[in-house]
Amino acid sequence: MKKNYFPILLLIIISCNQNPNSKTHEPWGVSQLLEPKLLSYKIESGKDIPKIISIGPGVVIKNSIGIGECRYNENIEKLKSLVSGYKKDDKIVLYCGCCPFKNCPNIRPAFTLMNKLGFKNHKLLNIKNNIKADWIDMGYQTE
């Protein structure tokens, strides 16, 4: 009996060529995560400071603009309105910090919107636990 390995080989090739970001099912890639320490350094140095947008319940980080929780459509519209004045290659950092990163209801809708609008240089602040533990308790700059 002759076995046909072509379908299996085809599946292996397709799976090897998948975008690594698609495996996480997140709208951002690893390269689009910005560590809090690096953003703090940029704010402190005053050089190369990106546009910083809070998409959560409060404005904590120095120099940031508050939009409100982006789980709500009216705040997604506020974000859309704000960034309509930005260039597609502007450096932009979004952050929330309301809860552990994996459970946050605000970051995915906001980041998805930025992708759909064609922004090329937007990042998500890598707040793994919450804004208190990952920013305030670290002594980083606050409003």
Feature locations, PLM:
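Flexible, polar/low-complexity N-terminal or interdomain linker segments that lie immediately upstream
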Residues: 11-61
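Intrinsic disorder/low-complexity signature
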Residues: 1-2, 14
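Rhodanese-like catalytic fold shared by cysteine-dependent sulfurtransferases
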Residues: 16-30, 59-93, 97-143
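Sec-dependent signal peptide recognition
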Residues: 2-9
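Generic alpha-helical structural signal
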Residues: 10-11, 114
